[in-house]
């Protein structure tokens, strides 16, 4: 997963489940920023799926 990747929120425990966004910043190996329609949030890569 790298900056600019198109991702979908796949964690069903997340309020943003199913939303599609773009990785905007990688903080470290454990967290990334993703811009989704609801805003820009920090996610764990395990809760995201690269789709493009």
Give each language-model segment a name.
Residues 2-52:
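Basic/aromatic-rich interaction segments and small domains that mediate binding to polyanionic partners
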